[in-house]
């Protein structure tokens, strides 16, 4: 009999807790509190993810701590699913960023990551939109200028290459650290996951 890959909303929410730090260890009670779900239900999903070798656990006193199984290449694909789930739920609740994504996603070659106040859910009426673009190519700044004018918003854009992103993660660069801890991937989820996976998988 094959394993059952029953991936639902709760599974995505659990895995999303690990997308900011692939080395994170977290116990059941904290997971349940973070995703606002009953501990018993969370425990069922954690057991399933552990049986699938996506998570692994260690006993710390009376608590069981869970962390990503970075030795399983399939875990990377679960992280991509978790990031995608986060993006979908975020865009459905944030019309401005959803509109922005529609305006620029097909015009910019590379991954696009939202960070700053909008990614943290702290944006105000006059907040700027902060974007990181991961690309090997130059960006046509006119696209950003035109989009900012259409939306009536200031758009701050920073660029980096996949290699520089990986170096930034490795060197604990303050900006890259901020982005990995609070982000929404608007395009190119696999690019961010790959960069973080390479670093954390080699530690």
Model-derived segments and spans:
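Short beta-strand->loop micro-motif that forms the acidic, two-metal-ion catalytic signature
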Residues: 131-133
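Catalytic core of pol beta-like nucleotidyltransferases
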Residues: 1-108, 120-126, 135-203
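Short helix-loop-helix/strand-helix junction enriched in hydrophobic and basic residues
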Residues: 110-118
């Amino acid at each position: 009999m094959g394993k059952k890959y029953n991936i639902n909303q709760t599974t995505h929410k659990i895995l999303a807790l690990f997308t900011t730090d692939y080395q994170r260890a977290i116990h059941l009670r904290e997971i349940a509190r973070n995703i606002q779900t009953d501990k018993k239900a969370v425990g069922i999903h954690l057991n399933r993810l552990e049986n699938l070798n996506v998570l692994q656990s260690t006993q710390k006193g009376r608590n069981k701590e869970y962390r990503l199984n970075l030795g399983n290449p399939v875990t990377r694909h679960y992280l991509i699913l978790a990031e995608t789930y986060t993006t979908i739920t975020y865009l459905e609740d944030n019309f401005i960023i959803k509109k922005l994504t529609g305006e620029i996603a097909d015009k910019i070659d590379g991954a696009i990551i939202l960070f700053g106040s909008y990614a943290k859910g702290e944006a105000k009426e006059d907040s700027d939109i902060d974007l990181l673009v991961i690309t090997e190519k130059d960006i046509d700044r006119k696209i950003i200028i035109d989009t900012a004018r259409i939306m009536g918003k200031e758009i701050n854009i920073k660029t980096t290459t996949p290699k520089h992103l990986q170096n930034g993660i490795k060197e604990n660069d303050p900006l890259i650290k901020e982005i990995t801890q609070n982000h929404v991937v608007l395009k190119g989820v696999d690019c961010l996951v790959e960069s973080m996976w390479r670093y954390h998988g080699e530690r």
